[in-house]
Amino acid sequence: PTLDDTMPDTERLSRFAQAAFDGCTEVRLTYHTVKKLAKTLRDANFKVLVSGTLTDGVLTVMDVSEKPDAPLYGCAIDIGTTTVTGVLMDLATGTLTAKASAGNGQIRYGADVINRIVSRIFRVCIASNTTMNHLLLGVDANPVRMEPYIPTFFQWRGMTAKDLGFPANPDAEILLAPNIGSYVGGDITAGAFTSLIWDKDEFSLFIDLGTNGELVFGNRDFMMSCACSAGPAFEGGDISCGMRATDGAVESVKIDRDTMEPTLGIVGPDGQKPVGICGSGIIDVIAELYRTSIISSKGQFVREGKRVAHDEHGMGRYILATAAESETGREISITEVDIDSFIRAKAAIFSAINIMLSSLDMDVTVLSHVYVAGGIGSGINMENAVRIGMLPDIDRELFEYLGNTSLSGAYAMARSDCAVDKVDELASNMTYLELSTNPRYMDEFVAACFLPHTNRELFPSSIQE
């Protein structure tokens, strides 16, 4: 600017921004940006990096930096009932800068990292279930759990970081993946997007294993969703030695039929001793105990050996690691109570599959793909998941483990408006089936509370040795 060019800073910046960004017809500067604009422009001799979002021709300027190489960051967060996982990414390259996971309480990146980059976070995408979405926004979630199970909202846009007190640029956009029903939330719309079942001609099934087991069935023509209360067992909750899939978690188990000795796969570096057992390990150990006839179809111990013990009440348990073998100096075992809890969790999943398919006059023979998601370990032994009656007894090549699809979907939304639009489209077009009001669901659930099922004809390949 000069005495002959007295255009105000805001207008000068707006004109240059419109010229620099293709498709930009209007520029809006946030209050946070205007407050520091004069000093930043002059410190940088009017050579600045403009950061913001361009939507429908409107550029919302969130920051003006004198550093030409200042990074653009985004956050993707999966808020589960049991676990919260988040990643910090470079929006320009997609490179992950940091990752953190914790029990659902408070999640933090390292203090030094967040202090350096907080003002450069311009988009935050969150995928969580319906209840967690309500709690995050401070909205009453009680109606979600009471008949007729009506949430306050399915979708809510227009929020910024300052609205939620989120550690980011105060004008950073907060995007919630939209909910579908009372118990099918944004974690599933984001997950269904990741699975790509919406882009296939064949029928596929998507299953997210968590405290709420959530399912989506369909193809490019239609999709149906439902949810069942599986409890936290898949994530190690309600299991005496259960834990999340972090260092020290037993994630795979093989048991010798004759000696009853276990071979354990443990999360962590070589030599890592076991601390507890995560979801994938629980599936394995129950399947192996059943395969080797150590437990009955009711989950009760029927064989004796040095790895099988009983408490003063006669309650049996299988010892995966003695106190001397564990990292903590405490015995790691799975009890009959643990097994019963997990049988109920797997029964909820299988009965939900049956009810959803039968509501469409279909059965598992129509499935061309079964995608399984959830943060329960580095993978699932599908053979064992079928053996215990959690997944249908179909060709194992049809199964694929996708990991944390809720987080993957949130990551895609953070980097692409096209992904945001597609997730919104999936949510608006998906039919929601309320299992809690289905009169057949409880009968199906009770029938599935055995290993593998009361109807053995459904699981011809599940045999005991």
Task: Please describe what each predicted stretch is.
Residues 1-76, 81, 93, 119-123, ...:
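Nucleotide/phosphate-binding catalytic cleft detector across ATP-hydrolyzing
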Residues 119, 188-191, 195, 343-365:
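Phosphate/ATP-binding catalytic cores across multiple sugar-kinase/actin-like superfamilies
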Residues 129-143, 314, 362-365, 374-393, ...:
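Short glycine/threonine-rich loop-to-helix capping motif typified by GTGT followed
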Residues 283-345:
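Gly/charged contiguous loops adjacent to phosphate- or pyrophosphate-bearing nucleotide/cofactor binding elements
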Residues 219-224, 238-239, 358, 362-426:
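Catalytic phosphate/nucleotide-handling subdomain of diverse soluble enzymes
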